[in-house]
């Protein structure tokens, strides 16, 4: 990744999306970048519910006493390290500070928007997926239905059904990945 050049291209894309309130225009703009690897990767990292960075720009900015630490010169390597929790806590803050320390203010703002998972373009995963189908993985929690509403439609003799006790306040799914790591996801 050529950081300066790629960040400029991402910022131009963001500025174009910010320049219109029309949903159809936003979809058209996103479609123009469908073959752009960096833009698509930026959208995936920013809007995928399965990519969590465990750090916000506010946390980075408020820890003024922590000195920047250099070690990452590629945005996506840094974000991968945050997602995989290779770097955490004060180390994570220091590496992010080290990554942005020599950047122009607009570049820092862009990196912080990606870190906060919001490019501030008034777009989301649904709109992006209308323009580029399946670009952003979505997470849909199955919602319960009352048995009384389904009573005539259910045939326990010929269909397989699973039931679970509904617990108030517990609205999440546990997903075990290929490495055996269990992650919990909830509706946003």
Language-model regions: role of each:
Residues 1-188:
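N-terminal nucleic-acid-engaging modules of covalent nucleotidyltransferase systems
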